[in-house]
Design a protein with these regions (language model features):
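Catalytic loop of the DD-peptidase/beta-lactamase superfamily, centered on the K-T-G motif
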Residues: 4-73, 225, 232, 274-462
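Short active-site loop at a secondary-structure junction
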Residues: 48-56, 77-134, 197-211, 287-290, ...
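Short, solvent-exposed turn/loop segments enriched in Gly/Ser/Thr/Pro and often Arg
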Residues: 61, 65, 115, 122, ...
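Short, surface-exposed loop or secondary-structure junction motifs
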Residues: 71, 126-383
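Glycine-rich His-Gly loop
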Residues: 92, 139, 420-421
Length: 462
């Protein structure tokens, strides 16, 4: 295996600090409309306080972060507001970090290793599943969430053999008596009990949380470090993401722990009751597929760092006489197989959109000429309990003439992160996190973002 994440050590911070966070009044106006929508869900007896959960938003245009701000309440009981330092559960947005860890450890050739190299006790089908299949959701492994439900429905004795109560507990949430909580170790046991796969690996894309739990375990076995420690040392700390952490089996937090001082609570919108806090689930203890917690300012730093990778990749992609550099990190943006034609492609923890289009531009002589452009976007949703999140990144650039490199002046990019702590968005598609992100993007790129990059399907499929 190659040395891990050496290039990350050269990156310090995200290009801004908490004392200089920018704000855009147009986004403020949009988010005020969003908060009014949430307040409309309050019953009459709760409207006096006006307290509603909310969201945190970060926007980057080019290499400049133009907006980082929180809206609404992080905790309805205390009235604490959402700020750039408020911590959210990222849900499946966590997958991009797990994938990035794996791509920092393994070479392209090593991504072809069968997972049986790391899981000796797995059935024979593990010889046919490669590490890259876990990353790209082409392993054919059944989702452990489904296996968990099936186990609960089976004979209690069999279930108890697989699942034993651990000692961990989830931050800020009361533990329920007689709860049977699933951990990564239990997921491995559930997978090992599946004697056959429903289909062959690498045939189809099929979203599976199981693969990312296994990927977290592979990172641990390959580096002798838990995913939490590896990411902290090689990603979070070098990038200044000081409030971001993985909640794993070593996490025995208490309410006054530093990691939880600014942690939001999440709320379901219940008719007649307003917003009801949600927190406990016996599935709160698995990680790799989720369970990374972060702030909007930390996520802005992460997006800002990825922009440096974008620029290097795009500007070199069409350079004359230059071979495309092949490394594991480039697989971040490499698509796997599609499940069906209406689905966007998937890379390493990101859904992918690619497009080519024509546009009229002003030439040096002042005339308008038609040029061909390319666009590329990556996005992912993250939903868990009442946490609903969205991250999207987009680039566009003019294709150069044959034999010419890409002109950096034609390259534009944008990044948007939306973190929310409520489910009141779901009935109203206008304020669903991905739809909200599209509205924000239109403030900067007009209808281009929606017409050429976001195709309207991604909200349903991410």
């Amino acid at each position: 295996m190659k040395s891990s994440a050496v290039s990350l050590k050269k990156v310090r911070g995200g290009g801004f600090d908490l004392d200089e966070l920018p704000s855009d009044e147009r986004i403020d106006a949009l988010m005020e409309k969003y908060l009014r929508r949430l307040r409309s869900a309050l019953p009459k007896h709760k409207r006096a306080t006006g307290r509603v959960p909310g969201a945190a938003i970060a926007v980057r245009k080019g290499s400049k972060v133009v907006h980082v701000k929180g809206y609404g309440c992080a905790n309805l009981e205390t009235g604490e507001n959402i700020t750039p330092e408020t911590v959210f559960d990222l849900g499946s947005v966590s997958k991009q970090f797990t994938a990035f860890a794996a791509l920092s450890i393994f070479s392209v050739a090593e991504l072809e290793y069968p997972i049986s190299k790391f899981f000796r006790g797995f059935p024979r089908y593990a010889d046919k599943i490669k590490i890259k299949n876990l990353i790209q959701h082409t392993s054919a492994l059944p989702d452990y969430l489904d296996l968990h439900v099936a186990a609960r429905m089976s004979a209690e004795g069999w279930y108890d053999r697989v699942l034993k109560r651990p000692d961990d507990w989830y931050p800020l949430m009361p533990r329920r008596k007689k709860a049977k909580e699933l951990t990564n170790k239990h997921v491995l046991k559930l997978v090992a009990l599946q004697s056959l796969l429903p289909r062959a690996p690498e045939v189809n894309f099929e979203y599976s949380n199981t693969g990312y739990v296994l990927l977290a375990e592979i990172v641990r076995r390959a580096t002798k470090q838990r995913l939490s420690k590896f990411l902290k040392e090689n990603v979070f700390s070098p990038l200044g993401m000081n409030s971001t952490f993985v909640f794993d089996e070593t996490s025995k937090f208490r309410k006054k722990a530093p990691e939880l001082l600014h942690h939001a609570r999440c709320y379901n919108a219940v008719k007649g009751k307003g917003f009801v806090p949600v927190g406990y689930s016996p599935l709160n203890f698995t990680y790799g597929d989720g369970n990374i917690h972060s702030t909007i300012v930390d996520m802005a730093k992460w997006d800002h760092y990825l922009t440096t990778l974008d620029r290097e990749t795009i500007l070199a992609s069409d350079a004359p006489g230059r071979k495309r550099e092949v490394n594991a990190r480039s697989i971040l943006w490499e698509p796997a197989k599609k499940l069906h034609e209406q689905q966007d492609e998937y890379g390493a923890g990101w859904y992918l959109l690619r497009n080519k289009y024509k546009d009229n531009v002003k030439a040096k002589n002042g005339r308008r000429v038609t040029k061909t452009f390319r666009s590329r976007a990556e996005y992912h949703r993250g939903e868990w309990l009442a946490w609903e999140n969205y991250i999207a990144r987009a680039q566009k650039w003019m294709l150069p003439a044959k034999g010419k490199p890409v002109d950096p002046e034609t390259w534009e990019s944008m990044g948007i992160v939306v973190l929310t702590n409520n489910t009141a968005n779901a009935p109203n598609k206008e304020f669903y996190p991905c739809a909200l992100g599209t509205q924000i993007a239109k403030l900067y790129w007009g209808n281009f973002f929606e017409d050429n990059i976001i195709n309207g399907v991604n909200c349903a499929l991410a």
